[in-house]
Amino acid sequence: MLREVTITRAIVESYYRDLLNNLELDVAIVGAGPSGMVAAYYLAKGGAKVAIFEKKLSIGGGIWGGGMGFNKVVVQDEAREILDEFGIRYEEFEKGYYVADAIEVATTIASKVVKSGVKIFNMIEVEDLVIKDNRVSGIVINWTPVLMAGLHVDPLTIEAKYVIDSTGHGAQVAQFLVKRGLLKEIPGEGAMWAEQGEKLTVKNTREVFPGLYVTGMAANAIAGAPRMGPIFGGMFLSGRKAAQEILKKLKS
């Protein structure tokens, strides 16, 4: 016989256990878009304890819609090896241009991330940062519906040695530092220029404040660099670069 209360208990107890197990992290990633998920995968693969916090109900960021709702994405030569590592199928459109199904990209990356040991907490929004001794030391979290409704409910905190801002165009985590005068004003992304946007996304992936890395479009927003549209190689390479740099620091 199925009992509703047993179903409820199973959900509450297992979620509670997951949350307790992720209160202290090596890396807390904010945003489950392409760069954030790829960073999580490589961090977990390197032995780091990592979790992702996504404010929306769904994960994947801008992958799902491809270009203008045509659910295909393009990846260039430099990032093709990442598609291969994740086992994502693609076809060559022209030399140096590879096309993949956006749904396969989003679901395959997400599956690999979860199976690598990363816990993704969706519907949880980061509303502030923990800052101690002039260093980002964690994130302040609350339920997305609570913040959407404007309810006065105090948040909880997650401790982390490093935080990654993978929130995309708004660079929402870095904005908390701007608000407190700890980071200069964020100019936002520039106009579309795919080639430069892709290169600069990787170049701008860095630690912008002690304990805080930026990846993907958040990295370009902070630098005022161009947007690039539905080509995702830069996002993937950005996530991998952040993971590699953080792993070196964790092991030093």
From Swiss-Prot:
Signal peptide extent: none
A GO biological-process term: thiamine biosynthetic process
Binding-site list for Fe cation: D154, H169
EC number: 2.4.2.59
List of residues binding glycine: R227
Pathway as given in its UniProt record: Cofactor biosynthesis; thiamine diphosphate biosynthesis
Cofactor: Fe(2+)
Recorded superkingdom: Archaea
Gene Ontology terms for molecular function: iron ion binding; pentosyltransferase activity
Assembly notes: Homooctamer; tetramer of dimers.
Role: Involved in the biosynthesis of the thiazole moiety of thiamine. Catalyzes the conversion of NAD and glycine to adenosine diphosphate 5-(2-hydroxyethyl)-4-methylthiazole-2-carboxylate (ADT), an adenylated thiazole intermediate, using free sulfide as a source of sulfur.
UniProt xrefs under NCBIfam families: sulfide-dependent adenosine diphosphate thiazole synthase (TIGR00292)
Family: Belongs to the THI4 family.
Protein name (Swiss-Prot/TrEMBL): Thiamine thiazole synthase
Species the sequence originates in: Pyrococcus horikoshii (strain ATCC 700860 / DSM 12428 / JCM 9974 / NBRC 100139 / OT-3)
